[in-house]
């Protein structure tokens, strides 16, 4: 019963906030224009500030233990493994390259910052957030760099290495991560008033992002892509965490480390994947539908994963 309640405590706040967003859209307190603006604010300002502070709060990279480095190395490798498996599955069957890139991205690229922080905070509190913040140093740049490469490669346009580099460098989450690392390496201390301001701004990120995500959920036009959506949801919400957490346990990770890996792999497809797909000539409609369906279904699957791992005493 205790494990059941813990799992509920993880997913219910996410569900309630997303439901609020959905209702606000229905009663016309938010429209497409305002949601687009809020989405940009979340992505470029609030989420980036949150990510910067989480990295900055690590404090000292020289204090990283071998276990920390092992976790970072594993996260990087397993992302590549999941991406390769998704490519092997979809490459022979999906002839439309614009859909192929979106499906691959939908499987490996999760909404790690948003859902990951919420999941780990619910289970382990600040102690767990330190581990997730550490993972962001590797996970966020890897997610985004690979997304730019895949979407550009399958866009049907001539590939420019300079354009690829620009797409990577301009990503707000990558910039925030790198800034956090630079502040740590140079031992730059942020004055208390500025830190307090940044901290207050960062607290807006998670609830507002969930409100926007809930408001943007649309299920009316998904029939034409139903077979792609079913496979993407199974691979994203079941296959990815099964591989990532299962192999992670075999490698020797446990407790907070496994929860961090679960939050990386079991969360829904990143909201930014929709924006990036539209900007890079991929199938934006399919990308948005994958984000919407995985976001809704993940409420149930994350609950099941947390409950199962708790009962197995892995976390």
Cite the ranges covered by each PLM segment.
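Alpha-helical transmembrane segments of multi-pass small-molecule/ion transporters
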Residues: 1-315
